[in-house]
Amino acid sequence: MASLGAAAEPERNLFGKDEAEAYESPEGRRSGRKKRTKIVPVWENKPCGSSRSLVRRIGSHLPLKPCTRACFEALPSASNLYFTDTPMVPTLADIKWIAADDDETYARVRSDTRPLKHKWRPSPLLVMQRNSSVPNLKMKEEKMFCLKKPGLSLNRSSDIQEELSILRSQIARIVAGDSVSSCLGSDSIPVNVDLEASLPDYGPSYQSTTSFVISDITEEDELDVSEYSSASLVDSTISLQRQIETNMSDDDEDSMCLSKSNSFADMMGILKDIHKMKLNRDWSNRNQCLHKEEDPVNLISEVLRQKFALCDPDNVNNE
């Protein structure tokens, strides 16, 4: 009987209340069989709930083992340089901390101490490894400076064109002054009403244009320059123009070679320079359309045409 009572105790714990306790209350007497079939789980009164018992059962049956840890073995022949706290190769956080300043030949990371130059004697292997793993900013600056050469050549060509236009205007003024003085002072020129009417009209109009084009030339400079002959000045300007064109062609060839060899050029700067050149061309074309008669080339040709048309053929032969 004792063994039967002991066997009945787990059933009580598993299924809950005893039959005697169920029949003591009047409600238990009314529904006696229903109370008998009620199941109360074992983990109802435990604070951890049902998940803990399930996980424990699953974990006890599964062969779970911890992961193996990596073990490092120190070689006896290695130097003490490899056992320092600083890493050999810079990490991603050290990319901005590039020590290519002060003309140093090695790259350092943030964790490195900054030694004195006379004390720091790195091995060639360390220098090669650091320089190959970390980019050098100075090389990039030199490349960018080389890539800016086309823009510099374009600015230089625009400055040369401006100087050439100033020289043309000066020569036109000198030739006009020489032609007017020679034609008025010579006795071989027939005095006509049309000539007298045409030359005074041409003088003030030309002075107004030259005063607008050339504003920084004084009267003393004009007197000094007027001593030279017009033919020598024209020849010198032609030779100067040819030399400028050859220099511009060389600059263009250099810029083309640079643009072909360096495909990653700074295209924004080159495009800005080209845009400036286009604006200068448009401005010059607009001025030529508006002031076509004020062009120095037209003035020179007109003065020479009047000079040789007004003079006698005998004077032309003598000249």
Curated annotation (Swiss-Prot):
GO biological process: aerobic respiration; mitochondrial fission
Location in or out of the cell: Mitochondrion outer membrane
Function, as annotated: Mitochondrial protein required for adaptation of miochondrial dynamics to metabolic changes. Regulates mitochondrial morphology at steady state and mediates AMPK-dependent stress-induced mitochondrial fragmentation via the control of OPA1 levels.
Main location: mitochondrion
Positions of disulphide bridges: none
Composition skew (Basic and acidic residues), residue ranges: 9-30
Organism: Xenopus laevis
Family of this protein: Belongs to the MTFR1 family.
Keywords associated with the record: Membrane, Mitochondrion, Mitochondrion outer membrane
A Pfam short name: Mito_fiss_reg
Protein's membrane topology: Peripheral membrane protein
CC annotations in GO: mitochondrial outer membrane; mitochondrion
Protein name: Mitochondrial fission regulator 1-like-A
